[in-house]
Amino acid sequence: MDAGAPTWLVAGLGNPGARYARTRHNIGWLALDALASEPFREEKRFDGEVARCDGAWLIKPTTFMNLSGVAVRALADFYKVPHDRVLVVLDDAALPFGRLRIRPSGSAGSHNGLESILVHFATQEVPRLRIGIGAPPPPMALHDYVLAPFGPDEEGTLKAVLDRSAEAIRVILKNGLAAAMNEFNKEGL
């Protein structure tokens, strides 16, 4: 991490409960599980599961996706983490499975979890790591697709995707967004 810079808060988006544990919409949680150097612990005051890694705070909001901003903002306020040091890790159906895209800011697109965070911080200047989950096959609705478990082909490469996502987060924490964007915003695994 940058000496003297504020710490990072990394928020992995997902939904609580066994029903959602291995679904595409929970890839943010799965990426944080791959990253964490200690077990997550439930923190009711932050509406989430919290851990530490490389000096950063990690949170898996347990508010359900559409209210993720409540949990992320609570932890950021408590530890005085500015919005530009909050990294949101989320699924993206517009990216091919396994593709990573790191951005320092932008709109939420159609992602309600990211939208909740942007609303709670009142800015679009919140960094994010989007992890591609691919588009739903026709005629499947996007809502059904993101809440479905990974397919057999995806499960076969999921560990590599999660390991690469965790490595991208580590590069962000250590060297910053620009370095990570140069290294990971490329096609494929």
Named regions from a protein language model:
Residues M1-S105, L114-L129, P136-A141, A148, ...:
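Nucleotide and nucleotide-moiety/phosphate-recognizing core
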